[in-house]
Amino acid sequence: MRKLLPFIGNPHGSGRSALTCRYRCGDACFHEVPNTSDNEYVGDVIARAYSRRAMLRSAAVVTVATAAGSAVAFGGPGQTANATPSADAAAAGAGKGGEAARGLRFKAVAPNTDDKVTIPEGHEQNLVIRWGDPIVKGAPGFNPDKQTAAAQAGQFGYNNDFLSLLPLGGDYERQQLLVANHEYTDENLMFKAYDANNPTREQVEIAWAAHGLSVVAVQEDHRSGKLTAISRHQLNRRLHTTSEFRLTGPAAGGALLKTSVDPTGTKVLGTLNNCAGGTTPWGTTLHGEENFNQYFANAGQVTDPTQAARLKRYGVTSGATERKWERFDKRFDVAQEPNESHRFGWVVELDPYDPNSVPRKRTALGRFKHEAAQPRLTEDGRPVVYMGDDERFDYFYKFVSSKQMKKGNSRAAKEHNLTLLDEGTLYVAKLTGDSPAAELDGTGKLPHDGEFDGSGVWIKLATGNVSHVEGMTAEEVYVFTRLAADKVGATKMDRPEDVEPSPRTGRVYIALTNNTDRGKPGKEGATEANPRNLNKHGQILELAENFDDPAGDGFAWRLFLVAGDPNDPATYFAGFPKDKVSPISCPDNVAFDPHGNLWISTDGNQLGSHDGLFGVATAGERRGELKQFLTVPRGAETCGPLIQDKRVLVSVQHPGEIDGASVEKPQSVWPDGPGKIVRPAVVSVWRKDGRNIGVCPDQLTRGGVSRETPPRASTSLNRHIVLNSPPVSCPREAGASSPRPRRARWRTPPRSPARPPAPSRW
């Protein structure tokens, strides 16, 4: 019998180092949970559904009760409870029999603790760009011993996260624009002899300049997936803590967003803690402001009880902040500038093609710890944006625009599309288990039918200037969205981070990273959607909108993956044999490849190995087959995955961020080797033979040129984005188990005029 992999974590049950916790999120998990509402916890929801199934099975009931008017049904065999788990087979790329899913045909990387980026056999990699590399005209080369704020303002920022690539097209066919978030700074790894209690103004201003966003043109290699940054390109740009941003939408200009410096309530300096994001169909990028609360000081000095409660709900620092920015700019002191923190925690929209544009913070999408924001379109062309609030026991949301996207690259279309995220309806999710509570011990033990699932509804919070929450104005709903969601009874989740709709099926996948507070005394226990107490490893929830209508108000849900050591009975991989998958812990970011496979990056692996990037099939016979594609260096996190036909792009964030590390005592030598300062960077990975990632051999022509790569459109420099690339298909191969993925087990009946949409059950 195989042993479980070791649990590695800090005293609070996190796989991150204390250094990462301190600088990334202000030790969020060491503070009290901000959500003190009595709203239902998703673990309780799961528990009821499981208990109900157990009772039905014990009574020999073999049919699943389905609500009248169900919009989505769910069937098919689940994972058997007695599956023999093994993490070892994953390293050999073993599977159910036959080939792996298309796009995942590579030899899986074994878990390891190597201080490098480890990639599959037959692949190559290169550094695309690193912290400090000059990107704008006049920026000097990186010299950590002579760094200045002015230099950093023209160089690639620190701790890159979300990545997007937007093609330029036309005469610049082999060039793309790389857009990157810079989430946070770790001054211990940036400055020699750094004194956290007494930072200098120069150090603080360098850190201000190292936050924010970067736009960098990159050159493609026509024979491989290699990318090379084009320094000082005309479209290159840095946005940081002192750059101008504009507040737009229904809350802009309101009293809650006005400050002594900005009496209009529409202009704000900077963007902070940008984590993940999204790329819109109209060619802009979205950027989530996540742990912004840690930058604001002295909430404990606020005496007004209403204001104090609002600050507490958002976790604003009670005393001095870790970075001490409030010493150098009073706007970071809420006792002196009470509304400044309200101007952070939004989704930022950027037009990368216009270096003179002012990025916009979209208030219609609500204010909370935005991990990401990824849109899809309704059938009539209205954007729907899914979002998670990365906090223990908080919620996930969606925004449905009231406007339709205009196609084309005309000025009129561009101007119209830049208003799409200012008008619409903001919703929060409430999940329901399909059965009453009966038995759940918090271990995550699967029910006899092998699935955690249920139904849900989207609850309206606000539409334009109209509030749907009793006792709150529309402005209050947008600025204090968490409090609005508390009032309407949204379901508490286990740190909902990245949320991505599949471009192939429309199903939505939500990364729930972990929650080690679940089940502790005084805290909510396990529920159906979060079935484990002291949840160290996290899970991924799959959501199907009723009638495949993203603008609707009902959905079905189920857990697609329950992470951890496959030897652990509490883990689950969508019914795929657990002895054929890679171990995974703490899913964070998610992305899709052109084949419809889900790719997952991890943050805070608690299984004793480094964080990594994983691919998993979401449909067909291989559904649930999880394979590790790469691992990152010591102390690093994998984030910002971007999967294209010929390359995999990732951010390697905070390498060497291990307790006790400093510039003088580095804990990693990546990426430049011994004697060099450790630098976060972007890495591109491709196949040595130049062929597409993870495809079948007979799909390719001679010379490594792929037939399935869609042709590039010839467009102007100012606007080009490929929408809805055709799915990649693979001819039947000898030994393959099926010529095409079979349909997923969710069944969506056609809409009937006599049967209106209703919450789904299965």
Provide a role label for each language-model segment.
Residues 211-218, 343-352, 399-400, 535-546, ...:
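Beta-propeller blade signature
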Residues 1-50:
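N-terminal secretory signal peptides
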Residues 48, 54-77:
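N-terminal export signals
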Residues 579-619:
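Loop/turn-rich, solvent-exposed surfaces of beta-rich toroidal or solenoidal domains
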Residues 114-130, 138-153, 223-265, 348-367, ...:
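Blade-edge beta-strand/turn elements of extracellular beta-propeller
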Residues 99-281, 286-293, 302-358, 382, ...:
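Long, well-ordered hydrophobic secondary-structure segments characteristic of membrane-embedded
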Residues 151-165, 263-276, 487-498, 576-591, ...:
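Signature of short aromatic-glycine-proline-rich micro-motifs recurring in repeat-based ectodomains
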Residues 201-207, 224-237, 394-480, 484, ...:
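Beta-propeller fold recognition
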